[in-house]
Amino acid sequence: MLGSSVKSVQPEVELSGGSGSGGDEGADESRGASRKAAAADGRGMLPKRAKAAGGSGSMAKASAAELKVFKSGSVDSRVPGGLPTSNLRKQKSLTNLSFLTDSEKKLQLYEPEWSDDMAKAPKGLGKLGPKGRETPLMSKTLSKSEHSLFQPKGGSTGGAKTPLAPLAPSLGKPSRIPRGPYAEVKPLSKAPEAAVSDDGKSDDELLSSKAKAQKGSGTVPSAKGQEERAFLKVDPELVVTVLGDLEQLLFSQMLDPESQRKRTVQNVLDLRQNLEETMSSLRGSQVTHSSLEMPCYDSDDANPRSVSSLSNRSSPLSWRYGQSSPRLQAGDAPSVGGSCRSEGPPAWYMHGERAHYSHTMPMRSPSKLSHISRLELVESLDSDEVDLKSGYMSDSDLMGKTMTEDDDITTGWDESSSISSGLSDASDNLSSEEFNASSSLNSLPTTPTASRRSSTIVLRTDSEKRSLAESGLNWFSESEEKTPKKLEYDSGSLKMEPGTSKWRRERPESCDDASKGGELKKPISLGHPGSLKKGKTPPVAVTSPITHTAQSALKVAGKPEGKATDKGKLAVKNTGLQRSSSDAGRDRLSDAKKPPSGIARPSTSGSFGYKKPPPATGTATVMQTGSSATLSKIQKSSGIPVKPVNGRKTSLDVSNSVEPGFLAPGARSNIQYRSLPRPAKSSSMSVTGRGGPRPVSSSIDPSLLSTKQGGLTPSRLKEPSKVASGRSTPAPVNQTDREKEKAKAKAVALDSDNISLKSIGSPESTPKNQASHPPATKLAELPPTPLRATAKSFVKPPSLANLDKVNSNSLDLPSSSDTHASKVPDLHAPSSSTGGPLPSCFTPSPAPILNINSASFSQGLELMSGFSVPKETRMYPKLSGLHRSMESLQMPMSLPSAFPSSAPIPTPPTAPSEEDTEELPWSGSPRAGQLDSSQRDRNTLPKKGLRYQLQSQEETKERRHSHTAGGLPESDDQAELPSPPALSMSLSAKGQLTNIVSPTAATTPRITRSNSIPTHEAAFELYSGSQMGSTLSLAERPKGMIRSGSFRDPTDDVHGSVLSLASSASSTYSSAEERMQSEQIRKLRRELESSQEKVATLTSQLSANANLVAAFEQSLVNMTSRLRHLAETAEEKDTELLDLRETIDFLKKKNSEAQAVIQGALNASEATPKELRIKRQNSSDSISSLNSITSHSSIGSSKDADAKKKKKKSWVYELRSSFNKAFSIKKGPKSASSYSDIEEIATPDSSAPSSPKLQHGSTETASPSIKSSTSSSVGTEVTETPAHSVPHTRLFQANEEEEPEKKEVSELRSELWEKEMKLTDIRLEALNSAHQLDQLRETMHNMQLEVDLLKAENDRLKVAPGPSSGCTPGQVPGSSALSSPRRSLGLALSHPFSPSLTDTDLSPMDGISTCGSKEEVTLRVVVRMPPQHIIKGDLKQQEFFLGCSKVSGKVDWKMLDEAVFQVFKDYISKMDPASTLGLSTESIHGYSLSHVKRVLDAEPPEMPPCRRGVNNISVALKGLKEKCVDSLVFETLIPKPMMQHYISLLLKHRRLVLSGPSGTGKTYLTNRLAEYLVERSGREVTDGIVSTFNMHQQSCKDLQLYLSNLANQIDRETGIGDVPLVILLDDLSEAGSISELVNGALTCKYHKCPYIIGTTNQPVKMTPNHGLHLSFRMLTFSNNVEPANGFLVRYLRRKLVESDSDVNANKEELLRVLDWVPKLWYHLHTFLEKHSTSDFLIGPCFFLSCPIGIEDFRTWFIDLWNNSIIPYLQEGAKDGIKVHGQKAAWEDPVEWVRDTLPWPSAQQDQSKLYHLPPPSVGPHSTASPPEDRTVKDSTPNSLDSDPLMAMLLKLQEAANYIESPDRETILDPNLQATL
C-alpha cells in the first residue's frame, strides 16, 4: 500500500467465511502464502472480511490475495516473503514513494523474520495465524510504479491482511521513504503498535500497508479477513493514508534500526493482539485493549503509531499547511480545495464552490496531484454524476456536494463523515486546524490530531510535509486512483488503469454500476484520487466509510448473489483498505478543512460529544437507504437510539473510551488512521463503492443493500458492489488499527458509539460522526433529533436535492467556515459547505475557510437560502458540523449540489429516499436524520456493518447523521459539539473535532470493522442476529464485534478490527513489556477518551437539545401556521356552508310562500295571469333553484375538496351549472304537450323573473354567488324582477278576491301544477344525482388527465435541456396545459359554464358532462396503421404522431371532427409543405376515441365524445377497403399518383423491377407493395405468402429451381394455399436477364403466377431483344425526381413533428438544420454524378438516421461525414476515374459543407470534417497519399454503406500500403492536420 502496487488477483474474495479461500491457490506466491496462512488458520485471513463473514469460526480462508510488488530500481528492499517485486506495479505518479509502516520498516530491518511473520501467522496472531504472512507480497515495497497497493484478491481475505503491516515493512524500502519529505515518525514502542494497529486497525494498516493488507496480511487480520472474505481493494485514499504512515515508519526506520526493530515488534504484537481481539470479537468477546492500543499509539506518538505515521492523515497537518502529506486522503479536500479547486478544470471547476475551494485550499500542494486525480475522477464523475461536482473538496465542500449529489455521493458516503475521517487524519496532523474541519476533525479526536500532528510534524517539517504531500499526495492521488483499481471490485469507479499514471476510474464500470446502483456512480468518481478532489472523490472517500457497509452490500448486490456474499466479506476487508484509501482521500479533504477545523475547535471533549451525536446520526441510516441494504436491514428501529452509534461504535469507542485526551495525539493519529480506514471504506466506496454506497443510500438504501448482502446492491452498483467488497476487505486491515482504537473507544462505550458513527460518517461526517460518536450513545437519542433538526433544514433542501446539489456544494463551502460555524449563514453554509467548502475550510488557515465561505459559501448560502436551511443556520450556529450532518442527511442535497444534473439521475431514486428520510427526520422523527447518520456510521464502522444489517436502514441513516452531528459541533464550538445539535453541526464544531477525532480514532477502527464487515457479510447477519447493529449502542456492542462484525464481548478492548490489531500486535510486539506498555497507554488513552467523551457527550447533549428545541420550535411554528391556514379555510368553508344553508332555508320558506300564493291564485278565479305566472313560476323556479342549490351544496362541497383551487367562484359556477341544467331540463318539459296548460299560467318569461324574484327576496341571506348565478341564469329577464317584488300579502288578497266560478279551473290547474311540480322534482333529483355522479367522474377523469399531463411534462423536461420557447402548433395547447395544469384548469372552468348557462338544448347527459367541461382535455392525435407481420424482419412504424388538440369537456362530435381535421391539416402542411403527397382531410376515414369509433361519412355515435379517461384519438386513413391508397401514401411518403401508378402496373403485369441508386427506398417500397397485394387478395396471412430471394446470397440457379417447382405445383393445382402470393427478388445483379429466367422457369398460366417484384441498384439497359418478353415492367428511381427527390424532406419533417418538438429549445434552428440535410444530399449526389459512375450514387436513406436535436445532429453528422460519406465518395471517385477518367474539375465537397454548416457553433466544427482528396490517376501513384490517408483514417471506422465496399476499401488500402511502406510517414502529418 505504501508504495507498492498491490494487485488483487482475486478481487472478489468470497464474502462468506472463506469459501473462496481455496479458489486462488493458483494465484501468486503471495496469494499462495496468504492462502497457506488461511489454510493453516482454517479460515480466510481477510480479517475484516472474515469477521464480517460471521463469527471467527465462520471465517473461511479467503483465497489469499496476490499482492504483486513491483520492485523499483530505487527501492532496494525486497518483499519479505521473497515475493517478487515483479508483482508490484511501478507508481506512475511522483508519489511512487514506497512508504513503510513501522511494522514494515521493522520487517525490512528484519526481513527474514518479517517474512516469516508475513508468511506465517504471527505467533501472537494465533487466531489469524493460519494465514500467516507466507507471502509478504505486500505492496509495502512500493516501487516507483503506480503507487498501487497490493490487492490480494483472495489472499487478503485469507489473512493477507495480517501481513499488512509486516508486508509493508518488508516491501517498503527505506530508499523509498526519502521520496517524499515525510516527517519521520520516531519508532516509539507504540509505533509498532501503530503498525500493528495498521494491521489491527485495518484502517491505518490498510492505509499504510494497503497493498500489504491486500496481499494477505490475513494473518493478523485473518479473522477479520475471514469475515470480510472480500479481498482487500486498496483505495487510492487509503493508499495515500498508508503512505503517510509508511513514510513515517520509513523515516523512523531510517532513524534507528533498534527503534525500528522495537516498533516492528510492537507492530507485530499489535497485530497479534488485534488478531486475538478480532477472533474474540468474532466469538462475541470484545477486546478493547487492541483498539485502545491503536488510539494510544496515535496519541502517544505519531511515530510509534505506525498508523499515524503510515496514514496520510498522520501528515494531515502538513497537508493542511500545504505540505505534502501523503495523507491527503478522505481529508485531502485541501489539496483539491487549493490546488485542485483552483486548477479545477474538470467538473470541479464547473461549480463556483469548487473554485472557492481552490481559493480556500491552501491545501497541500499534493492537492494538485490529487486535483489531477480528482479531475480524473471528475471526468468519470462527469459522465456519471455531474462534473464531479463534489470534487474532493473540504468536508463541507464534500458535504455540500454530496448533499447535492446526495444520491450518488451522499448515499455512497457520508461526505461529511468520510471526508471527516480523512480530515480527521489530517486533523491528527493539524490538530487545531483539523478540528476546524468538522468532518475530518470529527474523524480524528482533536487532541489525537494534535498528537498526530506532532508526530507528523516530528517526522516532517512543514516543507517536508509539503514535499511529501506533493509527492505523497500525488502518490496518494495516484495511489488513490490505483487503490480504486485495486478496489476494482471494491470501488469500480476507483479502478485504475495500470497503464495510466493517473488513477483511471475503471469507474465507468463502477460508475455505471454505481449509476445502476443509483448513486454509486458518483461515489465511484469520488473514489478517484483526482476525483477525490474535495468535492467528489473525497466525498466518495468520506462516504466510503459511511457507505462502506452499504457499499459492501451494494457491491455484493452488484455482483451475483453468491458473489455478492463473497463480496460482502470482501467488502468488509476492502472496506478497511478502502477506508484507508478513503482516509487518504479524506485526509485531503480533512486537510483542506482541517486547519479551520483545528482552529474552530480542537477540544477533544467536544469531539467526543460529537461522538455521541453520531449514534444519533445512526438515525440517518434511513438516509442511506440506497447505500446499504444491510443498513436498512440493520437500521435500528430506534432511529435515534444510540444503537446507530454501535454501527460505528467500535471506532468511536476506541478513540473515545481509550482517551479523550489520548485522542489528541495518538487518537488523532489513530483517528486519522481510522479516518483513513473509514476513508478506505469511503475510499473504496469513494472510488466505486463510496460513490456507490452513498449514491446507493440515495438510490438503493445502503442499508438495504447491506442487508441484502448484495441482493440489492447489484442493481445499484455492480462495480460499486465490488468496490464495497473490496472496501470491506481493506476495512479490516485498517480496522485493526481502528479496532484497537475501537477497543479503547469500547471502554467509552457511549463514546465509542459516537465515534463509530463518526467513522461511518467519515467520508463527510466522519469527523462529525466520530466527534459525535463519543456522545453518540448518550446523545444518540437526542442528537439524532437535533441532527435531524439541523439536517432537516438541509434535509428539506435536499428534498430539492437535485437543485440543491449545487447549493449544497455552495453550502459546503460555508461549511469550510466551520470556523464561522457559529455564523448563521455559516451554519447554513457549513451544511452545504461541509462537502464543498470544508476543503477550503480545511485549508491550513481559517482564512481559506472564510474564503470558501465567501465564494462557495455565499453561493451555497444562496442556494441554501432557497432551502429552509438558511434560516436553520441561525438556529444552529455550529451548523458547519451540522451541515456535515446535514450532508449526510442532505446527502442528496449535497450531491445534487455537486452534480446537479447527475445527482438527479442517481439521486432521484436514491436521493429522494434519502431526502424523504432526511425530511422525515427533520419534520418529525429524529430517526430519519439519525438513520442517515447511522448509515454513515455503518459505513464508518465496518463492524457496524453487521450492526447495520441489524439496524434498519433507518439506523444506518441514523448513524450517519450521528456522525455528521458529531462533526458538526466540532466546527462551531466544542461546547455545542456535545449537544445533539452539535451533531447536526459536526462540520460547524470543528474544535470539538479534536474530541471527535479521538473518538474518530476509535471510530476509525470501527469503521474499518464496519468495512471489514460489509453489510452483506455473514458477520453482518450475525450482528443483526444479535441485534447489536440495531439495538446495541456502540458501547453496548462489543468492539470486536463491531469491528470485525463478529460478536465480541463488549468489555473486550479489541474491536473486530482490534482483533486484527491484536494479531498484528502479537506479531508486532516481540516483547510482552512493549505490549503491556502499549496496553497501559491504551487504557490511559481510553480513560482520557472516556472523560473526553463524557464531556463531549454532555456538550453534545446540550447542543442536541438546543437543536431539538430549535427544530421543535420550527416545527411548532410550521404547524401553527398550517393550523391557522386550515382553520381559516375551514372557517371560510363554514361560512359558505352557512350562507348556502340560509339561502336554502330562505328559498324553502319562499317556496312554501310561493306555493301558498299559487294555491291562492289557482283558487282565485280572477288572478292576474302575471300573478299566477309569478306564483307558479315561483314554485317551479324555487324548486329548481332549491334543487340546484341543494345539489350544488352537496356536490360543491365534494367538489371543493376535489378542486381545492376553486374558491367562491367555484360556487358560482357550480350553482350556475346546476341552475342551468335544472332550467334546461325544465324548459324541455315545458315545451311538451303535458306542460301546455302550465305554460298558460307561467310562460318561460315569467318563470325566469320569478326566479330572480325569489333571489331578490333572498338577497339578504343568499350568498352573492347564488344571486349572481340565479340572475345569470335568469339572463336578460332579470329586469322583470321588480315586477315580482309585489308583497305576498297582496297576492294572497287578490287570490281571495278571485271569483269562485273559476275555482274548478283553478283546482284543476293546481292539480296539474302539483303533478308538474312533482315531476319536476323527480327530474331535478335525477338530474342532481346524475350531476353528482358525473361530477365525480369528471373530477377523477380530470385528475387522471392532470397526472398524465404532469408525467408527460416531467418526461419532456427530463429529455429537454430547458423549457422550449416554441412548439409545434399542434402541440402548443398541450404544452401550455402541461406547464400550468392548474391555470388551464381554471380557464377551462370559466368557459364551460357560460355555454352551459345559455345552452337550453342540452340533453340531460350533456348537462351532466358540463362539470367535466370545466377542464379542457388535451387529446393526442395519432394515425394508427394496421399491424401486419407479413414480411419477416420487417419492422414498420405502427403509430404516427400528428399533434395534440385541446377540446373542452363538453365537446360534441362535430367539434371533435373539426379538431381532428385541423390537426391533420397542420401535420400535412408541416410534413409536406409542397403538397406533393396528395393527402388532405379527405384522406381521413374516421377515428376512434377509446372504444367509440367515429366514421366521418356515417352518422355520429349516440354517445357523446370525450368521455372520461380518454386522451388518445386514433385516426384511420382511407385504404384498400375504401379503394384508396391514402394510408399507403401516408406511410411510405410516396406521392399518391405515383403509388397508384405502381399498383396499377403490378395488378396489370404482375411483375415489376425497381431500379435506382442504393438508399432510395426501393426495398422498403417493395415490402409495402407486397403487404398491399396480400391485403387486397384477401388470402389468409401465412409465413410463406410472401417469399423473399436475396440475389446476393442465392444464385440464379436456386431461383430457377424454386420457380420451376412452383410452376409445377401451380399446374397440378395442388396446395394452392401454400403458393406464395408475392415473390420479392432483392438486389438483382442483372435485371435484364431476370426476365428470361422467370419466363423460362415460371411456365404456368400468367394469371396464376405470383406477383414478382425485384430491385436492382444498376440501371436497366433494355435491349430490343429484352423488349420482346418484357414480362417485367421497369420503374426507375432517380434522386432527381420523385419519389426519392422529396422523400428526405418529408421524412425528416415527420421525424421532427413526432419528436415532440416543443422539447427542442429552438425550433427554427432545428428546422434550418433539417432542411439543410436534403441540400447536402443533393450536393453530394451532384458531385457523384460528375465524378463517379451512374450506379454509384448516394440515396436519401444515408441520412435517415439523422437525430432530432442540434447537439445530437452535430456529433452525428461529423461522424457520418468522416466515417461514411468520405469513404463512399472516395470509392465513387475512384470508380469514376477508372471508368470515365477525369470527367470534370475536382471540387472538394467539404468546402461547400463547411461553408453551409447550419448549426450555431459550426465554425468550431469545420476543422473536424475530413477533406476528400482528389483520386490519383494511377492506383498506386505517389500522388494519392492524401487520399490514402483519408481512407486510412476513415476505413477502420465502420462504414455505414455496404460492408462489402468497406472490405474492399480495406483490401485496397492494405495493398497500397504494402506496396508503398514509406507512405506512413507521408500520411502522418496530414492525418494530424485532419484531426
Curated annotation (Swiss-Prot):
Biased composition (Polar residues): 280-291, 618-638, 648-658, 696-712, 726-735, 753-772, 1244-1259, 1365-1381
Cited InterPro entries: AAA+_ATPase (IPR003593), Nav/unc-53 (IPR039041), P-loop_NTPase (IPR027417)
Residues the record lists as N-acetylmethionine modifications: 1
Biased composition (Low complexity): 304-318, 414-428, 436-456, 807-818, 893-902, 1179-1198, 1260-1281
Gene3D superfamilies: P-loop containing nucleotide triphosphate hydrolases
Basic and acidic residues bias spans: 479-489, 506-522, 558-569, 584-594
Disulfide bonds: none
Tissue specificity of this protein: Expressed in heart and brain. Present in brain (at protein level). In adult brain, found almost exclusively in areas of secondary neurogenesis from the hippocampus and the subventricular zone.
Residues recorded as bearing Phosphoserine in the entry: 93, 145, 197, 202, 299, 311, 315, 365, 394, 455, 477, 479, 493, 531, 544, 651, 752, 756, 762, 799, 810, 998, 1179, 1263, 1380
A Pfam family reported for this protein in Swiss-Prot or TrEMBL: Ubiquitin_6
Record region (Disordered): 1-63, 115-230, 280-339, 391-463, 477-783, 800-840, 893-982, 1172-1202, 1242-1306, 1359-1381, 1808-1841
PTM sites of type Omega-N-methylarginine: 690
Phosphothreonine, modified sites: 162, 537, 547, 575, 1004, 1168
Record-level GO BP terms: microtubule bundle formation; neuron migration
Molecular function GO terms recorded: ATP hydrolysis activity
Domain of life, source organism: Eukaryota
Alphabetized UniProt keyword annotations: Acetylation, Coiled coil, Cytoplasm, Cytoskeleton, Developmental protein, Differentiation, Methylation, Microtubule, Neurogenesis, Phosphoprotein
Coiled coil: 258-283, 733-758, 1070-1161, 1301-1360
Keyword Cytoplasm in record: yes
Localization per Swiss-Prot or TrEMBL: Cytoplasm, Cytoskeleton
SMART domains assigned to the protein according to its UniProt record, in alphabetical order: AAA
One cellular component term from this protein's GO annotations in UniProt: microtubule cytoskeleton
Homology family: Belongs to the Nav/unc-53 family.
Self-association state and partner proteins as the record states: Interacts with tubulin.
Free-text function comment from the UniProt entry: May be involved in neuronal migration.
Protein name, as recorded: Neuron navigator 1
Organism expressing this protein natively: Mus musculus (Mouse)
Source taxonomy: Eukaryota, Metazoa, Chordata, Craniata, Vertebrata
Gene transcribed to yield this protein: Nav1
